[in-house]
Regions:
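C-terminal regulatory/interaction module of P-loop NTP-utilizing enzymes
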Residues: 1-215
């Protein structure tokens, strides 16, 4: 007996005709993301299971379920976390966190860019950056947003009032900046739990009030 086993990305619509032909001849088994494979896996306090679940909930709403992220994105992170016992837990966890940073920078963010055709506002929604509005939380924002009027950009007499009078631009936080969101465990936690930043915001506001009272 000959068993033919293969994998296919049904989200790729260019394969639609082939997909139909294959479905008539083979049994199809859907392989969806399995967040439970990440259960109990924490890296610098970041719950990988909750992170994947929330990312996929948002992608499903903004796009569709076939484009949700597989748990395989985070398996190299888990492997490093549970890796070489001789290096110690702290060293393993740090290596895992660096891998998580690179996974977001080199895999997840570029994939989201492709999904949403560089609609950065939707990417911000997936990452929860829309919940980090105050200046005190700017270092936890992955995609920075800046709005400027056309007068500021072009000067007066630009003749663009027919369309709109301002432009919003986006840019990724600088990965080489050690204080940027990429390197902040709280930034990843805030993706699935925005309340973790409330203490930071409250502390910053208290410091500002204290400085004002000392003047």
């Amino acid at each position: 007996n000959l068993h033919i086993i293969g994998t296919m990305n049904t989200a790729d619509r260019s394969l639609a005709m082939m997909d139909t032909a294959l479905r008539r001849r083979f049994d199809f088994v859907e392989m969806m993301p399995e967040p439970k494979k990440l259960q109990g896996k924490l890296v610098n306090g970041i719950d990988l299971e909750r992170l994947l679940i929330v990312l996929n909930e948002r992608i499903e709403v903004l796009y569709d379920r076939e484009h949700t992220l597989g748990h395989a994105f985070f398996m190299p992170v888990v492997d490093l976390r549970d890796g070489n016992e001789q290096k110690g837990i702290e060293a393993n966890e740090q290596a895992a966190f660096i891998e998580l940073q690179n996974t977001f920078k080199n895999k997840i963010i570029p994939l989201l860019e492709e999904y949403f055709f560089e609609d950065w506002n939707k990417i911000r929604l997936v990452l929860g950056d829309n919940c980090k509005k105050s200046d005190a939380l700017s270092q936890y924002v992955f995609i920075q947003q800046h709005t400027a009027s056309y007068n500021d950009i072009f000067g007066s007499g630009h003749g663009l009032e027919t369309y709109e009078d301002k432009k919003t631009t986006y840019k990724l936080a600088d990965f080489n900046d050690e204080s940027a969101a990429w390197h902040q465990p709280l930034a990843y936690k805030a993706i699935y739990d925005a309340t973790v930043l409330k203490a930071v915001e409250k502390s910053t506001n208290s410091d500002d009030e204290q400085e004002s009272s000392n003047l």
